Amino acid sequence: MDVKDAFEKMKEEGLKTFEDTYGKEARERYGDATIDASNERMMALTKDEWEAKELLEDAIKVQLRIALQTQDPQSEAAQELAHMHEKWIAIHWGNGYKEQAYLGLVQGYLNDPRFVSYYDSAAGEGATEFLVQAIKSAHK
């Protein structure tokens, strides 16, 4: 298997993991067409674009730790965090999504222990709540 084939297989496995973990719930909430379009966007990413997406995800966790130290969701660091997160979501959803859908997704993080665990384990207890507050602040 060459590098390109290995990369395509890795993307397919990543999407399968997403579908196995969140697929049913995501399809019920956002519809098949939306999830299929997101999956198509992910499969169309080049290796460099995929790596940039992964680096952005890691950078969001670092920025969350930095911003959380301010304890101010309106701080410059928190607003940068919000911008980075929105950019990361746009990679998955594409541009032109509705602000209310994005804010609904983010608010949903607080109701889902998987997301709370993900963000809190990356940046400390209360990180998910802080992320949500920072994003809401950026959208006032």
Where do the PLM segments sit?
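Amphipathic alpha-helical "stalk" segments
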Residues: 1-140
